[in-house]
Amino acid sequence: MNLAIRGIACNLGEKAADTFHDDQHKDLKADFIMANPPFNQKAWRAENELTADPRWHGYDVPPTSNANYGWILNIVSKLSANGMAGFLLANGALSGDGTELNIRRQLLNNHLVEAIVILPRNMFYSTDISVTLWILAGNRKARTVEQNGELVKYRNRENEVLFIDLRQWGEPFEKKYIQFSKEQIAQIA
């Protein structure tokens, strides 16, 4: 609905469906992905469901108790070789143990995590918690690519992860919310 209101053309699939159980874009490989999946979604699959799902290939199966890492691996599975993804998750996704720790470790070993940005509380209408912006990149190796008719050189960033803690940043907005000023956005970028 949000996309339609804004006049943004998109392909959401042939029907309304549960992304995990009826993937409408099985073969999709995207250059850019932006997502705001439900935070800490409980009971998103039964214990014996989706255990051999190809989206988890090379990773542990995400726990049934919380879909955060199911969402992350769904996004990873959709990235093109040089794709970039940005998505929001609850901060707790940074510290889960067991299976979540193993998946997080494998994301790092696969050199996919470009940046982790912790945002201030009260930035969103739907929750007052601090959330984290994850940035993933499919190719972090040194390379030269043509963009808009110009050659752009990227240095090797495979063994680097940028961490930014912005929990103390922002300014009041509509009395109970926080937003970044234009100056702060320029400084962060």
What are the language-model segments listed below?
Residues 1-28:
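S-adenosyl-L-methionine
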Residues 21-23, 27-189:
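A conserved structural/catalytic subdomain of Rossmann-like adenosyl-cofactor enzymes
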